[in-house]
UniProtKB/Swiss-Prot annotation:
The keyword Chloroplast does not apply. N-hydroxylating monooxygenase involved in the biosynthesis of the siderophore putrebactin. Catalyzes the N-hydroxylation of the aliphatic diamine putrescine into N-hydroxyputrescine (NHP). The gene is pubA. This is Putrescine N-hydroxylase. InterPro entries: FAD/NAD-bd_sf, Lys/Orn_oxygenase. The lineage of its organism: Bacteria, Pseudomonadati, Pseudomonadota, Gammaproteobacteria, Alteromonadales.
Amino acid sequence: MTTPKKEIDRTIYDLLGIGIGPFNLGLAALCEPINDLSCLFLDAKTEFDWHPGMLINSSRLQTPFMSDLVTMADPTSRFSYLNFAKQTSRLYSFYIRENFFLPRHEYNQYCQWVSKQLSNLNFGVKVTQVNYNAGEGIYAVTAIDRRSGKPLTYLCRKLVLGTGTTPYLPDNCPIQDPRVMHSASYMQQKTYLQSQSAITVIGSGQSAAEIFYDLLQDIDIYGYQLNWMTRSPRFYPLEYTKLTLEMTSPDYVDYFHELSSEKRHRLITEQKSLYKGINAELINDIYDLLYQKRLISNIQCQLLTNVALTAIDTSGDKLKLQFKHLEQDYALDQLTSAVVLGTGYQYHLPDFIQGIKSQIEFDDHGQLAIQRDYGIDVRGDIFIQNAGLHTHGISSPDLGMGCYRNATILQAVLGYAPYPIETRIAFQTFAPCNIADAKRQPLESNTHSAVTPSKTRQGLNPSAKSVQQPSIEPQTALRIAPTGGNVSALMAPNKEAQ
C-alpha cells in the first residue's frame, strides 16, 4: 500500500487557528480586512455546525443579536448579523419581530453564512501534531485531509487554540449503554426517546431545561412518563439584572484576573447562577405548559431537586437510577427507560499539543496560566479561546465578549490594535483602590486603549498604527453565553448543575 505523500504549504502564516467554533470564526472574520496579516483556520469538521444536537426549535440565544461574530469589535463589518439579515431578506421581519434574542437555528445559519464567505477557513482538516522550530521561530502544524487521507503541514508564527469543549459525563454514568446519553446528542436521539415509556432528564442548567420543555410539549401525544431531577436545591434562574451584567465587562475581567487563584476559584463557585442558570422566561414557559397539560390530560411528570445521582444500574429492562437526597440524607431509586444527562461540558487540552506542551505555562494547581491577553506560553505565541473561566471569570464563555477577546488577541499578535478596545465601560467600580482613577477617567468614547499584557510580548508589527475605525461609544455589558456551561482549561469540570 502506497503512503500518501505529505503536502507542505510553504506559506508561513502570521496566525493559524485550530478549531472553528463561533469564537475562532469571529476571529477569522475580523482578520479578513487586515492587509498585513496572513492567517488560516483549520477544523476537522466538514462544515460549520454549532451544537447540532441542541438545535431545538424552541431554543434561542441568551445573548442579544449584537453578540454576533464581529459587531462589538467592528459595527461596520460586512459579517455582522444585521448584514446577514439584509442579505437574506429578513431584516424587516427581524425589525417587526422586536426580539433581540435570535433562535439558535438562525444563529447557526448566520455563522454558516459567514463561514462560506471567508477564504481563510479550511474545513475537513484534522490537526494531529504541533511542533516548534526554535531556530526559525516557526510552528509546524501537521494534519490529515479527512477527504483524501493526505498528510498536510502548515507553518505559522502564532497559534490560536479554539478546539472547544467536550460533553462532561459523571464517572458513575455508563455512557456505552445506548439508553444513557448526553444532552449534546439530544436532537439525534429525540425520536428514540419519544418511543420510550419513561424519560429522565438530569441537570438544572439551560440545556436540561430546554430538553425537558421540548419533551413536555408532546407528553400527552406519546404518553411517556417524564422526570426532571437535579442535585441543585432549586431550578435557579439566570441572573439577568443590568448591574450584574457588568461583570461581563473588560473592567471586571481586569479586576478578576488580578485576584489570587484561590479567590478566583471561590468566586466562580459562588457565581454559578450568573452563567449556569436557566433563562427566567423559559422557567415560566415550563410552568405554564405544565399547567396547560394537566388541564387536558393526566400526565405523568415529576420534578425533583436536591437529589444527587450516585449510580446507574443497567442490568434490567429498565435503567435503575440511584440517588441520594442531599437534605434529608436518604437513598431513592428511579426506574426509567432512558436518561438524558444535561451535565455540561469541560475543556481538555488537545492531544496534538504534546509537542509544544513544555512551552505552555501552568499554575500551581495544574491549570492553564492564561495571561490577561489570553496567551498561554512563555513567548506570547499561543493564545486560547473560551478556556479562561478560572482566570478571566464568567466572561470567558460569553458570546458577547468574544469580539473583545479577539480584538485583544489581534492586538497582541500584531503589536497594535486594529480594532478599538474598550477598557472602562462599567458604571460600577470593582476595586476600591481604583476609585480615584475611575473618577479621573470618564465613561466616554476615549476609553479605548490597548490591553496591557501580563508579560512583555512582541507583536508581528509593533511599529504599525491602528487600522482606521469609526469612533465607537462604550459598549454595554452583554448577557452570559448559552447552554452547556462552557468551561475553563484543566480545572475542575465546569458542569451544569446536575
